[in-house]
Design a protein with these regions (language model features):
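Short substrate-entry loop that stabilizes the transition state in hydrolases
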Residues: 57-105, 157, 170, 176-178, ...
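Cap/lid segment of the alpha/beta-hydrolase catalytic domain
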Residues: 96-126
């Protein structure tokens, strides 16, 4: 019994150290060069995001919103997803979430995240999107045909929510380890790229497969896909759409992580799918 307790304490201590290490990594992350914090007043609350405007690029610019996962930080996403290095020609926006209830990992709502339905959290993050989009369009030459949203986990689910709530604003969305919630389905076809780990312990792979099926129905996609790309640990398949809204599924053998190759494939997919293609 004593040996069992010692083993249990060792495992718990290791898990605690791992969690502490991840927290320190999140807090210590600094914004990449060129990413500048901007702020907006949304319903009397100061909201912030890191914004990267490319240098030396002329003409209307693509605009990409990149939403961190629950408990995440905009600085960590901007630095560790590699988006500024891979996409050098788009305006990139990394918003910072507020404390949010998560039924899966944070029932008390202590960590930052995004609303999970159209009406949850008073709709605050949808209004944040509206305010940021309007302001950025005033300040910069934004290409209306190339406005995109992507994210990881809760941020991926929020991109799906934007498809439901703001379909006319977007050209396409990207999801890494997220899912389309059952309490609201989009009705307007939209190109989607979805990265999923077959061993995801949090957003179960079966849930993500159900999302694939729902997206194919909404977008009028073929049941059988064709090879599209291999990148990092990802093997991607494209499902052609009769409505001009293809689905790409990029699968890997891992879990809930932001998988290697995700950003490269999302950048390519967005470039291939402007609005009205």
């Amino acid at each position: 019994m004593r040996r069992f307790l010692l083993i249990l304490l060792t495992v718990l201590a290791a898990a605690s150290l791992s969690a502490q290490g991840k927290i320190r990594e999140l807090l210590a992350a600094k914004a990449p060069e060129g990413c500048v914090e901007q702020s907006w007043d949304v319903d009397g609350v100061k909201r912030t995001a890191l914004v990267r405007v490319p240098n030396g690029v002329t003409g209307p610019l693509a605009l990409v919103f990149c939403w961190h996962g629950h408990g995440g930080r905009s600085t960590h996403s901007a630095r560790h997803w590699g988006y500024p290095e891979i996409d050098k020609t788009s305006i990139l926006v990394f918003p910072q979430g507020l404390p949010t209830v998560s039924p899966l990992v944070d029932k008390e709502g202590r960590m930052p995240g995004w609303q999970t339905s159209v009406t949850s959290e008073g709709g605050r993050d949808l209004r944040l999107f509206d305010v940021m989009l309007a302001d950025l369009k005033k300040k910069h030459a934004v290409d209306e045909r190339r406005i995109y949203s992507m994210g990881h986990s809760n941020g991926a689910a929020f991109s799906y929510l934007l498809w439901q709530a703001r379909p006319d604003a977007l050209a396409a969305i990207g999801s890494v380890a997220g899912s389309l919630r059952g309490d609201g389905k989009p009705t307007t076809p939209l190109p989607v790229i979805h990265v999923a780990g077959k061993k995801d312990p949090l957003v179960k792979f079966a849930w993500q497969q159900a999302t694939f099926a729902a997206v194919r129905r909404i977008n009028g996609c073929a049941e059988e896909g064709q090879p599209w790309a291999k990148e990092g640990v990802l093997d991607a398949t494209i499902y052609a759409s009769s409505k001009g809204a293809p689905l790409v599924t990029a699968l890997h053998e891992g879990g809930h992580e932001y998988a290697k190759g995700s950003t490269e494939l999302i950048v390519r997919f967005f470039r291939e799918n402007p609005k009205g293609k």
